[in-house]
Amino acid sequence: MAKKTKKTEEITKKFGDERWKALDDALKNIGKDFGKGAVMRLGERAEEKVQVMSSGSLALDIALGAGGYPKGRIIEIYGPESSGKTTVALHAVAQTQKEGGIAAFIDAEHALDPAYAAALGVNIDELLLSQPDSGEQGLEIACKLIDSGAVDLVVVDSVAALVPRAEIDGDIGDSHVGLQARMMSQAMRKLSASINKTKTIAIFINQLREKVGIMFGNPETTPGGRALKFYAYVALDVRGNTQIKGTGDKKDQNVGKETKIKVVKNKVAPPFKEAFVEIMYGEGISQTGELVKIASDIGIIQKAGAWFSYNGEKIGQGSENAKKYLADHPEIFAEIDHKVRVHYGLIELDEDDVVEDTQVEDTSDELILDLDSTIEIEE
């Protein structure tokens, strides 16, 4: 029988034990018919905090608030052409594989570059790739992969390229009003429960379109109807900003671009936070670059003039040399990355971190004692 609380005792006084007995019988019957856990008290759930997986970008993890993409949820990434949407998604694929998971990529645009994916850290030998003939086929493949429970991440690139079969079979110029929106709406209804149950992360990349005749307000919209907007737990707006000039022999060349990623929807943490990353051509997001900037902003890496220092040791003159130092010393990179994540509350404190704080306090006490003893001697 269910454990009684103060409120349940009051109900029992009013209506007797029959009401609780009827509820217990109903819960048992529901469990038999639909399986254990079909109905439960919210406090009985083992997991209260949403599990996350790193996005592969420290700046984006901080902007997301929880430290990465929530597991068992739908993510939408949209933005203008060549803004870095696929790059952001491929970093998530690389991170999934790095953590020992399995990732699948539904390439509806038929435009995935294996060499570029490999440069971003994706193990292309282990990546599951599908290039579907129609939108229904692509979504059905994604559904079967998610239902299997064996895949940790599914990326669909892109929603705009998921063309309904009726449109493919028809002639150019035929009207197919609402076909794609109905297809996406049906897919979201079918996928959402399965995604949550299997704790799979589903990333849908989307393009931008403009509404005709809009004089006021934002004319931009995304294809595929409103279903994805409703079902998405997190939505990211990716926009490329200024070009990054090279140094040395490449000083006249553009080697990358500064990109702004805005969290326009977030059900895990407060939305509308922004992450600024450097996407280097042929390399992806500069993880050393964002670490140098963030760590120096919060004082973990010290900056004096053009020099960057860590723990009293100079690591480079200028940001480029500091980035090179961190790339050549992965153990230092991991140590600084850990401290930054602890600072922003993305991960819990380790015992080592607590010990370090204790040591600092003890040292300060010793200094105070020494100062007092000195004063006594002078008197």
Curated annotation (Swiss-Prot):
Signal peptide: none annotated. Keywords: ATP-binding, Cytoplasm, DNA damage, DNA recombination, DNA repair, DNA-binding, Nucleotide-binding, SOS response. It comes from the Bacteria. Its main location: cytoplasm. Pfam families: RecA, RecA_C. InterPro entries: AAA+_ATPase (IPR003593), DNA_recomb/repair_RecA (IPR013765), P-loop_NTPase (IPR027417), RecA-like_C (IPR049261), RecA-like_N (IPR049428), RecA_ATP-bd (IPR020588), RecA_C_sf (IPR023400), RecA_monomer-monomer_interface (IPR020587). It is found in: Cytoplasm. SUPFAM superfamilies: P-loop containing nucleoside triphosphate hydrolases (SSF52540), RecA protein, C-terminal domain (SSF54752). SMART domains: AAA. GO terms for biological process: DNA recombination; DNA repair; SOS response. GO terms for molecular function: ATP binding; ATP hydrolysis activity; ATP-dependent DNA damage sensor activity; damaged DNA binding; single-stranded DNA binding. ATP binds at residues 79-86. GO terms for cellular component: cytosol. HAMAP family: RecA (MF_00268). Belongs to the RecA family. PANTHER family: MITOCHONDRIAL DNA REPAIR PROTEIN RECA HOMOLOG-RELATED, RECA. Can catalyze the hydrolysis of ATP in the presence of single-stranded DNA, the ATP-dependent uptake of single-stranded DNA by duplex DNA, and the ATP-dependent hybridization of homologous single-stranded DNAs. It interacts with LexA causing its activation and leading to its autocatalytic cleavage. This is Protein RecA.
